[in-house]
Structures are given as C-alpha cells and as structure tokens.
Amino acid sequence: LMLTLYPSKGLDRVRPAAAADYFLRGGLISWLSNTIIGIVPVARDKAGTGVDVLEPVRAALKAGDIVLIFPEGTRGDGEEMAQLKSGVARLAADVPEAPVYPIWLQGAGRVLPKGEALPVPMNCTVLVGDPLHWRGDRQAFLGELRARLEDLKAKAPPQRWA
C-alpha cells in the first residue's frame, strides 16, 4: 500500500523495514521480499541479545534510501495506534539528516488483515504529515510524532465500515 504513494521512477529507493523472521522464512515470500519489494530486514527475534537489529535500517537511511517504518514496531491491529517504540527515535538520532514523515493509514488493516496473504479490495485513506526532524531528545521526539499521528487520524474522513 505504501509503495503506491511514490512515483515509479524513484521506487527502487523506497524500502520497507520488515520482520526478517516472517518475510525471509523461505520460498516465494522471501524471493518477493528481496527481489521485488527490496525490504530492509529487521531481525526482531534478536532484539535484546546485544545485536543491533536496526543496523540494516540505519545503513539504508545513510545510503539515501527512503525507509518505511511502522513506529509501533509492527503494523498493528485495526485502526488503533499502539505504543510507539524507541527505534524510530534512535534512527532519527543516528541519521538526523533523514526526516521522519508521519503517515496515518486508515483502513489498511481491513485491506490486508494481519496474518492474511491476499489483500481484500477496499478503499484506504493515507494522510501524510509535515516532516519531523531530530532535536536531541528521545521522549520529546516520540511525543511529537505521536501527537502528529493523532492529528492526522483526527483529520481522516469517517470510516464507512464502522
């Protein structure tokens, strides 16, 4: 869904951060994830083991790629925003020249529910906010990002399926 927001000319620079344990588990999904989509794999199963699971994302940002990140650490369930994880703030601190654009996706959970393989034809609303830049404080950054996401959510049209 997010890849459709970008012109095809620069699409090779747009790379979703994605769970390596899911998208690189083998077979067709691994091939599609690497060859067609060009994911930045995040080894979330190694978090807390001393391995820097964000290093591939950091490297992609430093290389000038546009990396799509769900700041909750996953795409979540339904239309509710989960607690934001610190990873997005750590990346902003490490690569301050890379702006963070808050994006609110309304209806994405209905188009491709978590655990499903095939999308369901349905309309989605995508709202993109002004860029957020690192200013030196992790909690302030996360608070501002959350406030901007909540503002975008409030601007979204009413859900017709509710």
Segments from the language model and where they lie:
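A conserved mid-domain beta-alpha-beta active-site/ligand-binding segment of alpha/beta enzyme cores
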Residues: 129, 144-149
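Helix-adjacent hinge/juxtasegments
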Residues: 40-48, 52-58, 62
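Short glycine-rich anion-binding loops that position phosphate/pyrophosphate groups of nucleotides
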Residues: 46, 72-76
